[in-house]
Regions:
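Beta-sandwich interaction modules
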Residues: 6-8, 19-34, 68-131
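Structural beta-strand segments of beta-rich domains
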Residues: 35-39
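Short glycine/proline-centered coil/turn motifs in the loop regions
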Residues: 44-46, 119
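Glycan-recognition and processing domains
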Residues: 1-17
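Short, solvent-exposed secondary-structure boundary/capping segments
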Residues: 62-66
Length: 131
């Protein structure tokens, strides 16, 4: 069952530098096996760091979460001519970022959430996922 759901809605910086969203079901929660999750992150003058975290446990504790690799839209060519996609764990914004960007993460994740840290300014308009 493909669906677009909100991981994190409209949030304005209030002086708190960290925020963790509620968890949402990933592919494995719904029995899908391709593991493809497409993210859309909409920011307005945001300064901080965003991580997408995942768990493969049905009832996760704090220790069951890990940082998912996020494949961006930047491509690189290595010395053999192979074209690869850049992969990140953190999306770090050290100057005000206003953008809407898409990323992919792949894994048979039961749960997915967003973790925001070092937030010093701006707005997170939304973080959505299509699984």
């Amino acid at each position: 069952m493909r669906a677009t759901i909100s991981i994190l809605g409209y949030n304005v910086f209030t002086g708190t530098s960290t925020l963790v969203s509620d968890k949402v079901g990933g592919d494995a929660y719904f029995g899908a096996d391709d593991g493809l999750h497409t993210l859309m992150i909409d920011l307005d003058s945001f300064i901080g760091s965003i991580k997408i975290q995942a768990s493969i446990v049905k009832t996760p504790t704090d220790d069951d979460w890990f940082n998912a690799e996020i494949a961006g839209t930047t491509f690189a060519v290595d010395t053999t001519g192979k074209v690869g996609t850049s992969v990140a764990i953190n999306l770090d914004y050290t100057s005000a970022e206003t953008s809407i960007k898409t990323y992919n993460t792949v894994g048979n994740f039961v749960w997915i959430r967003a973790s925001i840290s070092n937030w010093t300014a701006g707005i997170i308009k939304r973080i959505e996922i299509n699984r």
